Structure formats: structure tokens, C-alpha cells
Amino acid sequence: MMQSRTHTCGQLRIENAGEHVTLVGWMENVRVVGNNFAFLVLRDFYGTTQIVVETEEIMNIVKGINKESTISVTGTVRERASKNPKQPTGEIEVVPEKIELLGRCQYNELPFEINRSRDADETQRLKYRYLDLRNPAVKKNIILRCNVIAALRQAMMAHDFLEITTPILTASSPEGARDYLVPARKHPGKFYALPQAPQQFKQLLMTSGFDRYFQIAPCFRDEDARGDRSPGEFYQLDMEMAFAAQDDVFAVIEDVLPPIFAKYGKYNIASSAPFRRIAYKDALETYGSDKPDLRIDLTCKNISDLFESSEFEPFKGQTVKAVPISNCHLTRKQIEKLLTDCEVQAGTKGYWFKMDENGELAGGVAKFVQGCKDELTQRLGLTPNTLVVIAAGASATKLTGVLIKTFGANVEGHMDKERYEFCWIVDFPMYEIGDESGELEFCHNPFSMPGGGAATLDKAIRGEIDPLTITAQQYDLVCNGIELSSGAVRNHDPEIMIKAFELVRLGEDDVKKKFPAMYNAFCYGAPPHAGIAPGVDRMVMLLAGEDSIREIIPFPMNKNAQDILMGAPSEVTQKQLDELHIASPRTKNKTGSRRTAPHRRGSFCMGPERGDLRLFLLQFRRPGRII
């Protein structure tokens, strides 16, 4: 029977010298220095302790134990002769009188060294995630995640929010990404969906008479992975407030997040309230992005008028935007390398020139802009050693956003990296012209309250104003160039909702059919309400200073939405499929070709109804929006 530990492996100090103790943990390393003399490192969740073997009996036991086996060590604490000030337990060691094997590691070789697991191939790390997580450098991100979630929960409750859980099995609804569908055994041919967000439920809670709601909500979206987005499952701090406007939501977030970022973040400085507010249009004009990184002091200037009649064809009659970068001492090679990286990201060509130390324009396209040197100097504030990077054409705005972030991070003196800088992006357009349809569509969230309410929509319906000029009471929360969340003042009035959809060629019946619960609830008197849902995973990624969101998730999927550790997704038995009334995709006809599942009850396919839903979705929502 295992003897209970008296201390953890990170607990013992010089004051414990002479004490009789029992430690348990993983045998991290063994260094044999003589016939009956060896140093062991014992590791548990809390830290490491050095064990010094000095007897033949104990040495024989140690020789039969592989690294990463779990053991119990009972012995006496003594002061180290050679201390290690880098370790909390570096002043002591334990001399064992007894070592007991608790759980044997059956392999002589590990897939990777535990303390170097972050350098291993990612597929190996995910396959052996339980080994990867033994690495303190990996484990600390999960601990950080736990601490941040606990702090968020405590802060929200201090603001009188109630934590209410909402259903995981629900109806499929158009929210921007593909649903994860769950077949209903008792209802052949019908499906539940895992919620992309608790959007409708939290609005229904407001209609039910609850005043302030929150939860750490699991969300499920069948979308592709990227650095700041994990496929499949993610979590958000979902919140909603009744009888609230935009400023009420802002006040809560501005009070909750900065202290948590300052306490748990890699940097200890965070924006204080109020956060800067930037109109969507101004963000694009000034920063080339609706996700500006305000730690960077660079902005872009529109200089199109200077090149309306230019002989340089790429600039002639085009939108031309410039980003001046003062005190730039990059070489030509360095400039062109960074510019090429930006071109790849934005998918369009960039240009540059520089005012040298003598005040002359040189390099890049300098010879094509010499004719307007004085105007450029005045408009861009050029001084010696100022680099100017330029974007032109239809993708100029997109490229300037990339130029600002790339050069801002690589030219010394233009980015205060060690801080968290928040801002709100406000006044989003309600509508836009769809790239594929060429017709009016909702720009983001169709259930945001339009600026000006019903009166503005009526004018647009009558043709008195351009629908593209209507703004939505929607807002994004951005930190260090990363979108943490979207939120909105909700459209709680059924009549205004119908008018909003009418402009995109959808009628009252469409709204009632696709969103019956919410529409009907609003007809019984809904309060004005507003909310937001910052992404927990993205917040923790920022706080940890990680580039990949997978580093802060205990058991993440890979980029291809596969759980390598558990083997998901996996095939299931024909019996399971039959119980769910699903035709097997592996079924083949007599010629050996794959049989197409028919559009009938019990088939696992997208029927006409589901197809209509996707078409409906595409009319009003961009993929992957977090609301």
C-alpha cells in the first residue's frame, strides 16, 4: 500500500533539513556517477526535488525503473553541498531509505524528451499529449487558462451576473459556420445541432426576465483552423444584459478585463477605461484594418490625388496609400524581404522609397515620385531616414494593414510590445454588396439594432437613403491586433426585424420559419438588450504570449480537425448507423462504385430544407463571426 506523501516536490526548503519525508511523482531523470551513487530528479505537479542514492540496495531498485515511471520516495531531507539557486528546492536534497515503484513506464525510449517536448513534431505532441503536458512549460498554459476562467467568473459575479448554462443539443440555425449535426435516434431523418454560440438562448433569457446572464460557453463550429482559431470546439465569456445599451456593455468589459490581463498576462500593463473607440470606416482609413494593433504608432495616408495623372502606371488613377516610417535604418535587402512577406499575405504588390540622410528620395520607386517630392514631404511628414511603403489599387487598404503590422513590429522604436492595448471598433455598416451575389446583404450580425431604428429602415425601403449608409449598433473588441469578440445592441422589436430583412429580399415568413422561438418570444414584449462574448481561448493565448491557440487547450485537435490522441473522428459500426437511421457512406453497389445516398428519410444527407438554410445563411453572414 502506497504511503501518503508528506510534502510535494516543490515544497521542501532549507528549513526542512533533517525531516523525514515521503514524496511521490515521476522519475524525470537519473544520473549515475558511481557504483552505488546516483542523482534522481523527482517531479510532480508542483515542482522537482533532487534525490541522492547512496546505497547498493536503493541503487538496484533504481536500475530497474525506466524514466517517467511513478515512484514513492521516503527518506531524510538534508542541505545540498552544491546549491542550485535557479530552483525553489535547490538548497536541499532527499536521501532515500525506501523507493517504491507505483506505475511502471514500460518503454526504454520516450517519443520525445519531456522537458523539450515543445521542440518535437506537433503530430507527436498531440498523439502523446499526456506526455507533452508533463512538461512544466506546456502545463503552465493550462494552469493559466484555469486561473483566467476562475477570475472571469469571479469578476462577472461581482457585477451581479448570473451564471446560467444553456443547451448543448439544440436546433440547427444559420450562425455563420457549418453546424456539427447529431442524429436523433427517436426522430428518424432529423438532427440536433451543437450550438455555434448560445446567441438565441441568451436573448431568450433576457426576454424571460433575467437581467444579467453569463457563462463560460462551449461553442462548436465546423470551420477550418488557423493560428488564433481551433477547429471544432472553443469557449467564450458569453454575456447579455437586459435594459442595456452599448455603453453599459462597454463599462462591464472595461472593468473586468484590464485587471485580469495585468495580473495574469505576460505583460503587466493593460489599457485602463475607457478604451479607445474607433469607427469602422476610420479604422480602415487610418490603420488598413478593423483589427488595429494600437501598440504600433504607424498610420496610413491617402495620397491618391497626387498620382491621378501619374506616368507610373500602377499609381495612375488608382487608390494610393502610404505608410511613412521614421528613423528606419533597414537595408534595401531587409526592406524588400519584409515587403515580399507583406505581398504574400495581402495577395497584391507593394512599393517603397526612402528619404535618405541627405533628404533625397532614393530606392524602390523613388524616380517615379520625384515630381511630387515637396507634396509628399509635407503630407507624410518626411524627414531624413524615413521609409515610405506604399499600396495601390483595389487591395490598397488590405495591404496597408499588413504593412503597418509587419514593419511596425520590425522597425525599432515603432511598437511598444510589452503591453495590452484594447480598443472598440464601432459603427459597422449594417449592409454590404455581396462579392458573389452582387446584391445587398447583411454585413455581419442580422439581429443588431440599426442606427436610427425603424425610421432609418423605412427611408431605405422608400429609396430615400442608400442602405449602404446605415450603420449597425455592433461593436468589436480588439486587443493587440486580435479580435477578441463581436457584440451588439440587439434588435428586440419584431417589426424592426422584419424591415431589416426586407431590405435583403427576405420576408416575415422567412424570419418566422428560421427563428421561430426568438421571433415569437419578442412578440410578447422583449426588453432592449445588448451583449458580447469575448473568446476565452484567444484571451489566454494573448496572455500566454503564444502564437498558436493549440498551446493553451488541454487536448486540442490538429489543423485538420482530427483528435490524434483519441482517434476522432472515427468510423462507427453498422449497428450504430442502423439505430440512427443513417445510410452508410461505405455502402457500394454491385459494380463496386460508391452508392449515393438518396434524399429520403433516414439518409445522412443535406436535403432541400437544409440546402435552403445554407442559402439563407449565405445571404447575411460572414463565416466564423463570434457574437
Predicted feature locations:
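Class II aminoacyl-tRNA synthetase catalytic cores and aaRS-like
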Residues: 1-590, 602
